[in-house]
Amino acid sequence: MTLSKVFQYLASLDSKDLEELYKDPWTCQAILRSLPPRSKQYILKMLLVDTYPLSLAKDWSTQASIQQHKESLKKLFDLKIIFLDKINKPIQPQQQQSSQQSSSQQQQQQQQQQQQTEQTIRLNPLFQDNIKRSLVQVNQVIFSNNSSIKDNHKPPSIDDLDSYSKSQWEKVLYFLSDDTVQPSKLISELLLSSNLTKQEGDGLSITSEGFKFLLKDVYTQIWTLLIVYLDDLEKKKGKGSGSRNDLLSFLFRLSFLNLGRGYLVSELSEQQKEYLFALKQFGLIYMRTDSSILFYPTRLIISLTTGKTLSLIQSISSERTQTQKEQGYIVLETNYRLYAYTSSSLQISLLSLFVKMLYRLPNLAVGIITRESIRTALIHGITADQIIDFVRHNSHPNAANSGQPIPDVVAEQILLWEAERNRITYTKSVLYNSFPTNDCYIATLKFAKEQDYYIWSHDPLKTLVVKEEGNDPIRNFIKKNFA
C-alpha cells in the first residue's frame, strides 16, 4: 500500500506551509520514513553534501529502472524536499574568432563561450538539518509518559487499545452503511464535506463515493477524513492561522509514541487538547474519560505514517492471522442467493446496501440479490461495477479459487438492472411550437443543429426542442431573421 493520499495533500500545500512544517524535526522524520525506499536512499545520499549535479544523479539508477528513478525525484521535488538549481559552469574558451569582427563582438562571444549552464539538486536546508540532528540525537522525548503519574485506574492493555480503535472506526463506517445510525456532529460534517454522504430528509445516505470509500484500506480511509478535517479547520480558523500546520505536525509527532504507554494531557497546548478530543472519535487516541490526565495512542495513529494497517473489515489484532477471514467471506450462487460467512455486523450492514437479507445465524448470514435491492443501491449512487467489484474483492477463498467469484449470469443481470435506469437521459430544454412560417421552422432547425442546441423535432407539427442554453441565441435568431 502506498502513501499517495498524504503525499498528494502535502504536495498541494504552498511553499510557505511546507517550510513551516519542515521546521519541526518530528515532521521531517515522519515524512522520511513514509517515503518509498528509493526516495529515502536519495535523501540519505545527499544528506552530507550541499549540491549534487543532476546529470550524475542518473547513476543512482540502472537503465531498466529509469522510470522509477524519475518518479522518485519528482515526488521529492513536489514535496519541496529537493530543489533544482542552475549554475554557470566555466569551460575552456574556443579558438579566437576572425580578426574582422569588432572587439566588442569578440568579447561578448567569449563571455558566452566561457560559461555553460549546469543543473544541480540540493536538499531543503530545514529538512536536511532536522534529519541530521535526528541521526545524532538519541532518546529524544516528545511527551512525558506515565512512569511517575498514576490516575488510579488500571491502564489499558494493547489488546484493549486495539479493540477500542477497531470499535471506534467501525462506528464511522456504520454511519455510512446504516442511515438509521446517527453520527456525532464532527463525523457527520466530515462525511458530508467529503461527499461520502448526502442529505436526504432529516438523515444522511451513502453516495457512490462513500461506497468506494468502504472498499479502501483503513489507512486511506483515515487520511481521507483527516484531510477534510484539516481543510475545514483552515476555513474555520482562517487562512494563514497556522492551525492546519499545527495539526499536521501534531499527527506526525503522535505517530512516534509507544503503543501501550500513557502520556500526560497537561503537556499539550489548549489547541492540541482540542485536536486530541477530535482524534478520539476516529479511534486514534484513547482516553478513559474527557477529563483523564493521560492519553494513549492506538495502533492506528502510530501506523499513520507507515500505512501498515489492515482493513478494519478484518480485525486489527486477533483476526489478522486468519487468512480465510482476510481473503473474503462471500459466496454468491447463480440463483442470486448470497452466503456471508461472517459474524461481523458491519460486514452484514455493508451487504444490506445491495442485498435483501433473509436470515442470520451465529457465523452465517443469507440474503438474495433482487431487482429491487439493486435499484435501491443505484438510487443511493452506488454503481453496478462497484457492486460487482465489492463481491469479487470479498469473495470466499473457495469461490475465488474456482476462477468465478461472481457468476457471469449474476454480474450481467446487475449491469442490465443498471441499464434500465439509464435508458432515459434528462436534459434541461425549451420547446418551440409556434413558428410563423415553415421557412422559419426549417431555418431555425438548421441553426439549432449547427450550434449543437438541437435535441428533438417533429416536422409535421413544426415542433422543436432545444437545450436550455440555446434558448436566448435561438430567440435572437428568429427575431433577427423573421420578425
From Swiss-Prot:
Low complexity composition-biased segments: 94-116
Highest taxon in the source lineage: Eukaryota
Region Disordered: start-end pairs: 93-117
UniProt keyword 4Fe-4S, yes or no: no
Keyword Glycoprotein carried by entry: no
InterPro entries the record matches: Tfb2_C (IPR040662), TFIIH_p52/Tfb2 (IPR004598)
Biological processes per GO annotation: nucleotide-excision repair; transcription by RNA polymerase II
One annotated GO molecular function: double-stranded DNA binding
Main location: nucleus
Subcellular location field: Nucleus
Coiled coil spans: none
A GO CC annotation given for this chain: transcription factor TFIIH holo complex
Annotated keywords: DNA damage, DNA repair, Nucleus, Transcription, Transcription regulation
Subunit relationships: Component of the 7-subunit TFIIH core complex composed of XPB/repB, XPD/repD, gtf2h1, gtf2h2, gtf2h3, gtf2h4 and gtf2h5, which is active in NER. The core complex associates with the 3-subunit CDK-activating kinase (CAK) module composed of cycH/cyclin H, cdk7 and mnat1 to form the 10-subunit holoenzyme (holo-TFIIH) active in transcription.
Entry's family note: Belongs to the TFB2 family.
Its job: Component of the general transcription and DNA repair factor IIH (TFIIH) core complex, which is involved in general and transcription-coupled nucleotide excision repair (NER) of damaged DNA and, when complexed to CAK, in RNA transcription by RNA polymerase II. In NER, TFIIH acts by opening DNA around the lesion to allow the excision of the damaged oligonucleotide and its replacement by a new DNA fragment. In transcription, TFIIH has an essential role in transcription initiation.
Name of the protein in question: General transcription factor IIH subunit 4
Native organism: Dictyostelium discoideum
